[in-house]
């Protein structure tokens, strides 16, 4: 119930193994934490990675309800219901409202002008950075296209890592080509590919 002894020293972490890399987001200024609690991101010498978070008991219910994919492995004091079944519903593709759809389109096409500006001025990093932002909206639109085709009752995984399983091969290869940004010509081609994919995906939603 009292987390102070754990936070006073990190020595207890050695119980899990020899640590070769440790990050404590709550102690960082450049990368502040996004959630409640005190977390440790650990890599051990056998390359097993452990993400560990310490919470006060009164914060746990809120923490648990924020992500239904979390599973309780041990509840030695029987504080919580035993019938909690993990599920990934929090990560299912979200069906867009008309407003969200319009916002995505507006953001995507507005970003296009910044990519073009960077290319015309020979400012590669400026262009690439805004192309990255465009690609985020493209992925959002592609996920909606997939949702309308297959349903909104499943997840494409973190960072859309399973999206290729629902795309035509030629579309997937075209999407991958947008990451080839090692010349101004390739950045132009990436921009055009993003536009083509977005135009087609948005017309299907």
What residue ranges belong to the model's regions?
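A short, charged helix-loop
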Residues: 69-103
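Conserved nucleotidyltransferase catalytic core and NTase-mimicking acidic/glycine-rich helix/loop elements
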Residues: 91-205
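Short, low-complexity, polar/charged sequence segments that are solvent-exposed and flexible
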Residues: 15-20, 61, 70-74, 147
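Acidic, glycine- and histidine-enriched catalytic cores of nucleic acid- and nucleotide-handling enzymes
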Residues: 37-83
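Metal-dependent nucleotidyltransferase catalytic core
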Residues: 1-53
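A short, terminal or domain-edge coil/loop segment
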Residues: 26-39, 78-90, 176-187, 205
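Short secondary-structure transition/capping segments
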Residues: 20-26, 71-83, 131, 167-178
């Amino acid at each position: 119930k009292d987390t102070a002894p754990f936070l006073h020293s990190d020595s207890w972490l050695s119980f899990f193994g020899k640590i070769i890399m440790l990050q404590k987001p709550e102690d960082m200024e450049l990368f502040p934490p996004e959630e409640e609690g005190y977390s440790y991101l650990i890599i051990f010498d056998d390359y097993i990675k452990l993400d560990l978070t310490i919470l006060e008991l009164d914060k746990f219910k809120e923490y648990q309800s924020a992500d239904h994919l979390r599973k309780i492995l041990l509840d030695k004091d029987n504080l919580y219901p035993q019938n909690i079944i993990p599920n990934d519903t929090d990560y299912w593709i979200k069906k867009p409202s008309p407003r969200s759809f319009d916002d995505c389109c507006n953001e995507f096409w507005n970003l296009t002008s910044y990519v073009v500006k960077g290319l015309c001025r020979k400012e590669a990093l400026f262009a690439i950075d805004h192309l990255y932002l465009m690609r985020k909206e493209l992925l959002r639109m592609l996920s909606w296209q997939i949702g309308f085709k297959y349903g909104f009752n499943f997840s494409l995984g973190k960072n859309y890592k399973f999206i290729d399983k629902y795309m035509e091969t030629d579309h997937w290869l075209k999407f991958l080509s947008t990451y080839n940004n090692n010349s101004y010509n390739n950045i132009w081609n990436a921009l055009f590919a993003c536009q083509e994919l977005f135009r087609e995906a948005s017309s299907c939603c």
